[in-house]
Amino acid sequence: VERLAGGERTATAAAVATRARELGLAGPPLLVSAERFPDGLAAGVLAGAVLRAPLLSTRRDELSPPVYPWLASYGTGALTVVGGPVAVSPRVRCQIVTGFQYSFLCP
């Protein structure tokens, strides 16, 4: 058993995503709201079982500090944001646009 943790939920997600990369999950990461768990639950299945991709989380109105450095270090140049603008705001989407190809999975 290996314990993966961070100082708060977005840091924990980044720690798990880092370990996933180390274990060979090489698909483009998915980004979900750290504040709305249903998106994360649904995306977890897609990320792990289908895409073999890491799952990151962020605050709705501000890109969480662990996310951008993770993307800069481990990202594939692509990112999928799961959820609509209520889950991940347009402001956060604008923060991640530079340097990444991205897509949105919205209801």
Task: Describe each model-derived feature in a short phrase.
Residues 1-107:
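Extracellular glycan-binding segments that recognize GlcNAc-based cell-wall polysaccharides
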